[in-house]
């Protein structure tokens, strides 16, 4: 029993071959400029097997291309500058921007009104006041000291060989003087002081300021110290070295204490502030 050969116009029922033909027809309609390989109609004997081999064998030198999304021509690539940066913006519920950028020049410092600075410093002192060590004798600290006007000053000077004459705290620092008994021509007088309750200390030399009124026979030395800290006290003691001996005046072991201003701007003459609004 013989089987008849199908006519040449009969398309074999092969799904892969049909899919290949459909894909070629789609790309030909979308990309007319693409070159298609010439197809030769196979002979009578190689119709079925030649079509199958072309459907399964991959074409050489060709790459698969995806169809354009819009169905139109090729889209031109978007040019992007290397300096282009992406920006991200944040907005609140009303659509307003949450971030505000302000640019400052290094040479131009922002101008802050003086009353704002005073308020900020006052708040900082109130916040950190419990953390600061309380200087010894802070309750007894005063803005000015004048031991020379007290009774018994001459007797105390003879006993100690050195005594504080006067000291006063101002906005620019402390100015004071001391008297020392004239025991020799060469003598050295200095002031040891501290602004943090003697956790740290420094020593400042005193300069000869001439003879002091008798009695007893004595010389006067003047000194200058930094201003007391705000809300605190400056502690100091006097030191006298002469002929290999050393004498001290530390207010009977309590140290001398000068009180600073309670808050910034409390000392000195008030400064005008109206012109700040016109900067």
From Swiss-Prot:
Residues 28-86 are annotated as: Disordered. Keywords: Carbohydrate metabolism, Glycogen metabolism, Phosphoprotein. A motif (PP1-binding motif) lies at residues 87-90. The modification Phosphoserine is found at residues 16, 33, 66. One of its GO terms (molecular function) is [phosphorylase] phosphatase activity. Residues 176-198 are annotated as: Glycogen-binding motif. One of its GO terms (cellular component) is protein phosphatase type 1 complex. GO terms for biological process: glycogen metabolic process; positive regulation of glycogen biosynthetic process; regulation of glycogen biosynthetic process. The keyword Phosphoprotein applies. Residues 248-256 are annotated as: Substrate-binding motif. Expressed in skeletal muscle and heart with barely detectable levels in liver. Residues 154-259 form the CBM21 domain. The keyword Phosphoprotein applies. Residues 51-65 have a biased composition (Basic residues). The CBM21 domain is known to be involved in the localization to glycogen and is characteristic of some regulatory subunit of phosphatase complexes. This is Protein phosphatase 1 regulatory subunit 3E.
